[in-house]
Amino acid sequence: LRTILEFLNTHEYMYEHLMLKGGTAINLTVFNLPRLSVDIDLDFVPNLTREETIDERVRLTEILKKYMSEQGYSLSETSRFSHSLDAFHYNYVNAAGNRDMIKIEINYSLRTHVFSSEDRLVVTDAFGEPIKVRTVAAMEIFAAKTNALISRAAARDLYDFCNMADMKLFSDAENMFRKCIIFYATISANKVNKNFDTSAIDSIAFSKIKSDLFPVLAVRDKFNLEGKKHQAKE
């Protein structure tokens, strides 16, 4: 994970065209790796014409595939390439000698962001020497995370959201954070949840916490699911 992120942020072309977002950005650059997240979710940055974007997409794909192949990763047949999303699934053998997979997703549909990008330090000591990565602004990442929690209600979304609330990350900019949530709600769903109905959060079962969250937590503290649900809905 470190070597790939380092490549994406030291290769001039890749750095200029991509920004990290999602759970990996949250748990590497905002929090000190309380939960493991290795999927690399990226936004394509330049706001170009359709034709220009197609050309840049081809070049970007060639650079990424060449690098990953040189590093010993093999592209899986489970990879998906759609209208505006490229999902590269790479197989590799990990340090324990087991087969593993890392996912790199590049979204080409969101090329205009609310805030400028941020160069953020990876805060965990697990990477050794600190590196900087270009990310979507933290407020935007959590606005998208909030909408994901409301819509798909995944255990990891609840965990990340409640960590944000516990740390009061945007307590001095709550109005702007709400605007960002509305912005991402309008662009990320086929049907906008105008009432911001949070009832889907109630569907998160403790079995999902045990299967999807506990295995990737650095420290498995007692998890008060009902308390976390209430906190998120408030």
Regions found by a protein language model. Give the residues of each.
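Active-site glycine-centered loops adjacent to acidic/histidine catalytic or metal-binding residues
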Residues: 23
